[in-house]
């Protein structure tokens, strides 16, 4: 099963600690300071399969959203709300909608932070923090903190803190 790293960077690829991510699809990225210690630093950080702490992402309109493939032989360390890896391959460069859409196209659809999710009649839609979930009639829509959940007639909509449910 392919694993994915979702992260945001500045328009020039700059990230925390002055590390600059390549903005070319197919670029191999290696952590110059790799450490398998279970603490921040010493790796390439992001949200594994788009799930984790949405507060770690840059929500500004000019942020670049990256999705990187985590190869099977990459070292991965689980941190609280994020992970770090020793290397990965850039698979997508874009904005919030295109990056979360890329993950959805890869079959990663459950709880992706920032995702815009739509489900049809009697469908189920779930979005992570800052996400949007929409479901058709008799469907269920659930959104995380700061999210929006909308369901059609007879449906159920649930939103987290500061969210809106209709």
Where on the chain are the PLM-derived regions?
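Short, glycine-biased loop/turn motifs at secondary-structure junctions and
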Residues: 1-166
